[in-house]
């Protein structure tokens, strides 16, 4: 079984799997050593770790280089947050996916949000057509990549987020995509409604108020992501250590 097949299978288990969200080779090694079944980039974390703001500000070539380093180092399935695709044209997105798949990436997230200073949802029908073109191409060329559509109504705080999300999912599940990612959703009632609206596996993300993993499993969620929260906590803790060394005038805080 190759990594694509392993990754696909993870989405069919009764209990959701936890995705370790990485930003470099060291973080990838850390999650793999801890026993995680799969890893994936956080767009926020990988951008911040390299000195960029989120929202496709980090160059695609940098992401591709890091992806290659990761797949050469860890053996578990690796998926990548491609944001809106790093291209304004479908052909360009397809080329980017081919390049990533060529270095061993077996999944991508692609979002229905315009990557701009004021983020907003794209037209659902147009976006669905774009994804259909991508999945048709991948199927014809034998490219094994898990396409996870991220839909951002909850993340953007849209008033009718649940209705928007379900309406969009109905269009997106016809595209040939493999899964749906709904970051920002936390209500058990909303999560249950989204899960019940589609046959595709639902992915949720760490947020204040998100139910525990057992509850999410009971609701039918198949995949849980960390987003940038793990990265933020790592560097929050590191900042405290840096202050301790400076204030204590010794290294006791980092050698014990």
Task: Locate each region found by the language model.
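N-terminal charge/polar-biased segments
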Residues: 1-12, 246-256
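Conserved alpha/beta catalytic core and glycan-binding cleft of carbohydrate-active enzymes
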Residues: 226-256
């Amino acid at each position: 079984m190759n990594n694509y097949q392993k990754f696909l299978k993870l989405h069919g288990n009764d209990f959701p799997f936890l995705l370790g969200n990485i930003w470099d080779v060291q973080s990838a090694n850390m999650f793999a050593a801890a026993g995680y079944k799969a890893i994936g980039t956080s767009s926020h974390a990988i951008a911040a770790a390299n000195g960029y703001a989120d929202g496709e500000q980090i160059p695609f070539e940098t992401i591709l280089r890091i992806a290659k380093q990761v797949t050469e180092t860890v053996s578990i399935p690796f998926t990548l947050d491609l944001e809106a695709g790093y291209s304004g044209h479908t052909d360009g997105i397809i080329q980017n996916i081919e390049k990533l798949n060529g270095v061993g990436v077996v999944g991508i997230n692609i979002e229905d949000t315009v990557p701009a200073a004021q983020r907003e949802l794209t037209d659902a029908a147009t976006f669905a057509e774009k994804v259909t073109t991508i999945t048709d191409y991948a199927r014809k060329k034998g490219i094994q990549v898990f396409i996870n559509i991220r839909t951002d109504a909850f993340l953007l705080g849209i008033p009718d987020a649940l209705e928007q999300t379900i309406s969009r999912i109905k269009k997106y599940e016809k595209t040939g995509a493999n899964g749906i990612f709904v970051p920002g959703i936390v209500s058990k009632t909303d999560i249950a409604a989204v899960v019940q609206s589609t046959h595709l596996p639902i992915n949720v993300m760490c947020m204040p108020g998100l139910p525990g993993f057992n509850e999410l499993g009971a609701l039918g969620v198949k995949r849980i992501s960390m987003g940038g929260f793990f990265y933020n906590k790592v560097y929050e803790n590191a900042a405290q250590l840096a202050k301790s060394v400076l204030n204590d005038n010794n290294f006791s805080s980092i050698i014990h």
